[in-house]
Amino acid sequence: MRALTAAVLFVAGLTPVLAQDSSPTGPTFPNTVANCNAWYTIVKGDGCDTVEKKFKITPEQFFKWNPDVSTDCVKNFWVGNSYCVGVGKVVSSSKTSTTVKSSSTTQKTSSTSSKLSSSSKPVNTTTTPYSTRNPVTSYNLTQPYTATSLPPAKTQSGQPAYCNQWHWVGTGDTCLTILNLYGSRLTQEQLIIQHSEATALARTSYSVPWTSSQGNATVPAPTDYTPPVKTIVANFTASPQMTGVPQSCQNFYQAQDGDTCDVILKQFDYISREQFFSWNPALQGNCNGLWVGYYYCVANFATGVIPMPPTVTKVPDGAPTAINTCNKWYQAVGNDDCDAITTYFGTFSKSDFIKWNPSVYQDCSGLKTDSWYCVGIPGTPTTRTKPLTTTSLGSLPTQTGISASCKQYWLVSPSDTCASIISNAGVSADDFYKWNPALGGSACKGLQPNYYVCVSLTAAPTDSGSTTTITGPPTKGSNPPTTTTSGGGGGTIQTPSPIMPGMIGGCVRFWFRGKDGASLFCADIAKDAGVSLPDFLKWNPGVGSNCESLWADTWYCVGVSGKPTTMSSGIPTPASK
């Protein structure tokens, strides 16, 4: 018998032997099949596919035997853990631990007809996990938190004390998923107003319907949300902007910190990269060359060729199902409303849109950003039945009460505050709140994203007695509106372009920071110009209090009195020279 065993081992040694073990040598997962009799411990470089190939098993077999591993092999596939690569007879026992004698198991190899025999020793199997990634310790399972009083203990601050219905925020929840769940009785504005920290949704807010055994709480009547009334800025011009932008540009985008052309093209996905660079030639094809605060052209189409909004023909997740014949869907963005969507497409009426999408309600108050809506059924035209009318740059929303003499505006972003606008625009707080009464003073409760606020007036006084007057858009070319300045020392001058955002009104002395001035920073510029550093920073607030945003190829104010001058090369000189 020993001779026969030796012969078998000798023959087996001549063939490739798979690196499998009869028992795991590393930690295992609890749901691995109980009748596993072949194990493999993962090493660096392994993947599910390489293991399947190595042991000549199918993916279905591997994932069936190792159900804790995700089918994309991303979750629970760990180096050092043991996984099942072969099974024997199914073990069936009601006991926690059983001893099973396995019969001789054979496995044929592709290169030889010899057989590999497994050990005939008893194999101890158990239905209880016996290995973990960390030492087993005793722990107590606590019952999940359940609210027993109003309000629940795990809530975020700032929520109404009279609330009597709550939602537990789970993994994957967003404001949109919550609104979709309670959309019949909750609007986006109500959610935001009632949850001052809703933008920081985390798994800390517990929310389930709760009924008091002592009777219903007295709930004040709800206060309807009234959005600010939109008015139109009739004399707005996108400024500052880089040279070469076509005067016929129909729509602009103001670059934010961190923007690249890829960010813009994703937002305005109806234009191509080539179109964007042709409308903004100063970029010279540099996708990362955007200047924060500058306006870039994102639409300059000939009449009648404005592209249709992007749509999909495959039913997206979360799409409405009220119309089972819908064959085209559109995802709402930004400031969309029913009128705007109807106008953009020009292939259906507003009543059609509401009928296809009843979740928006008759007054369109249920329309939600990022949600999908039906925009086509069989028979809907594929091209506009009437041309899309483009609006001038003046169609920009401002809040009520804004100063009628305002000439420079600031588009409020979601991250803006009154303090940040005052700092970046270089205006005084008193003037800012006086020009924008809808903000509610220093409390700044009325500041609304995607609305314009006033940051400069006509004839704004300066210490030198000079005044600034906007003369309107240029008659040719693409520069921003010119500024004619009357200096205290006599003479007039036009503000050059481009300038830093927020430059003081009434500047009469300008210096261009070109290649020959690239080594100069705020303190150097102020010293050469014969002005104090605090004055330079006050006149050019866009550079930042630490001169961290000093731009090349840009004009800077170096004087608000003296003879009007533009210094386009070299270093700045004092007004006395």
UniProtKB/Swiss-Prot annotation:
Keyword Signal included in the entry's annotation: yes
Signal peptide start and end residues: 1-19
Span of domain LysM: 38-85, 251-298, 328-375, 408-455, 510-558
Disordered: region residues: 96-135, 464-490
Keywords: Chitin-binding, Glycoprotein, Repeat, Signal, Virulence
Glycosylation sites per record: 124, 140, 216, 235
InterPro entries (alphabetical): LysM1-like, LysM_dom, LysM_dom_sf
Biased composition (Low complexity): 96-121, 464-485
GO MF terms, alphabetically ordered: chitin binding
Induction of its expression: Expressed constitutively with no significant difference during colonization of banana roots.
Amino acid composition bias (Polar residues), ranges on this chain: 122-135
Function: Might have a role in sequestration of chitin oligosaccharides (breakdown products of fungal cell walls that are released during invasion and act as triggers of host immunity) to dampen host defense.
Domain topic, free-text comment: The LysM (lysin motif) domains are small globular domains involved in binding chitin in eukaryotes. Lys4 contains 5 LysM domains.
Additional free-text comment from the UniProt record: In plants, chitin acts as a microbe-associated molecular pattern (MAMP) that is recognized by lysin motif (LysM)-containing plant cell surface-localized pattern recognition receptors (PRRs) that activate a plethora of downstream immune responses.
Family assignment from sequence similarity: Belongs to the secreted LysM effector family.
Name this protein carries in UniProt: Secreted LysM effector Lys4
Species, as recorded: Pochonia chlamydosporia (strain 123)
Protein's gene: Lys4
